[in-house]
Amino acid sequence: TSMGFQGVR
């Protein structure tokens, strides 16, 4: 989940 806030890592 690299969308912005949850997949920021």
Curated annotation (Swiss-Prot):
Keywords: Amidation, Neuropeptide, Secreted. Its main location: secreted. This is Tachykinin-related peptide 2. It is found in: Secreted. One of its GO terms (biological process) is neuropeptide signaling pathway. The keyword DNA damage does not apply. It comes from Rhodnius prolixus. The modification Arginine amide is found at residue 9.
